């Protein structure tokens, strides 16, 4: 039997209250986190086992925007993406995500897959 995952849909710093989003409540398995940056500044997603932005951090993804848009030694890069395979990490209270852009805004986002 195949596993069926649910997705948070695209999350950005504009999602929820300033990038703070309750993705799921109650016991769930965290399968993966995907993120991308196409332009702008670096971006970060912090995922908590909770229903708020506190408690146990189960993942922290930071995608650096250096070398994008022809800046830096590798001028051909037009975007970056990253995936964390979380292998079904058990989140007892739920999944809460906080997305931030430390130095401004840009074209970026995250998705969280869970079951």
Model-identified regions with their sequence ranges:
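C-terminal interaction-tip segments
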Residues: 1-27, 99-115
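Exposed aromatic-hydrophobic patches
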Residues: 79-87
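Local beta-strand/beta-hairpin segments that build beta-sheet-rich folds
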Residues: 8, 22-25, 54-74
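Beta-strand-rich, repetitive solenoid scaffolds
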Residues: 47-48, 60-64, 85, 98-100, ...
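Noncatalytic modules at the cell exterior or secretory-pathway interfaces
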Residues: 31-33, 88-102
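Short, surface-exposed beta-strand/strand-loop-strand elements in extracellular ectodomains
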Residues: 40-61, 109
């Amino acid at each position: 039997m195949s596993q069926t995952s649910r997705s948070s849909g695209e999350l950005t710093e504009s999602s929820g209250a300033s990038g703070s989003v309750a993705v799921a409540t109650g016991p769930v398995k965290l399968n993966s986190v995907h993120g991308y940056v196409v332009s702008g500044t670096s971006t970060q997603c912090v995922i908590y086992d909770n229903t708020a932005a506190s408690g146990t951090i189960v993942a922290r993804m930071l995608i650096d925007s250096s070398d994008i848009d022809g800046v830096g030694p590798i001028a051909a890069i037009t975007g970056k993406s990253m995936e964390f395979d979380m292998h079904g990490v058990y989140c007892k209270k739920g999944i809460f995500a906080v997305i931030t852009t430390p130095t401004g805004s840009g074209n970026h986002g995250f998705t969280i897959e869970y079951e």
